[in-house]
Amino acid sequence: MIIKKSPEEIDKMARAGDVLVATLDLLEARIRPGVSTVELDTAAERFIRSRGATPTFKGYRGFPGSICASPNAMIVHGIPGPYRLKSGDVISIDVGVTLDGWVADAARTFPVEEVGKPAQNLLAGTERSLHAGVAECRPGNRMGDVSSAIQSAAEGAGLAVVRSLVGHGVGRSMHEDPQVPNYGKPGKGPLLEEGMVLAIEPMTTAGRPEVRMGGDGWAIFAQDGSPAAHFEFTVAITAEGPRVLTPWKRSAEAAPPPVEEVARAG
């Protein structure tokens, strides 16, 4: 069942989104060679809790981390651990924040220092596909309009869309109906209505779309070992069109601490 939200409830989700975006900004400032993914996780959890929120992922279906940290060919659901970032890596950071009972969910894939042109194209093309999908999140459109826009933008950049992983509704729970595929046909699928809130999240690879499960039962990898990217917004469908609740611009209220404080956080 699709649960629609009132404007007041969407505002509450946006406040969770403010904390989430500030968390991603904090982590971006820490991403450099030699930093371990568990250090990023520790800094994220500390920051989220300092803002009166909780990390949604921690304990969700037994997941042990506060964030998902997925480097290189790992597409999603990476458990933070001892892996230390290297120059030339790409790393997806997926964060969920719960504030006053409402969830926001977003992800970005970051380069570690300088990356080659294929990786630059991977990140830029996947982010463009996210924005293409968001632009279709309007009342009266169909889910297939969103899915097709994502697919067209990603494949137009020469990327493979991972078909076995999808976006989803979000609200008081992290995963709600409907599913949001990253491929499809315009005019097909559920009708988009005012009050729906969706996690739009293209996941792509620079190679083939097939995936494999990692040995820990969580991490999902590109089967061919090609680098992968994941970008995600939480988006509310309003009468005026899409409202991104996790934009890269943060509010002053939830702004991250200065860089010197970030350096002490982990």
Question: PLM features: residue spans?
Answer:
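Active-site neighborhoods and metal-handling regions in enzymes and metal-associated proteins
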Residues: 1-266
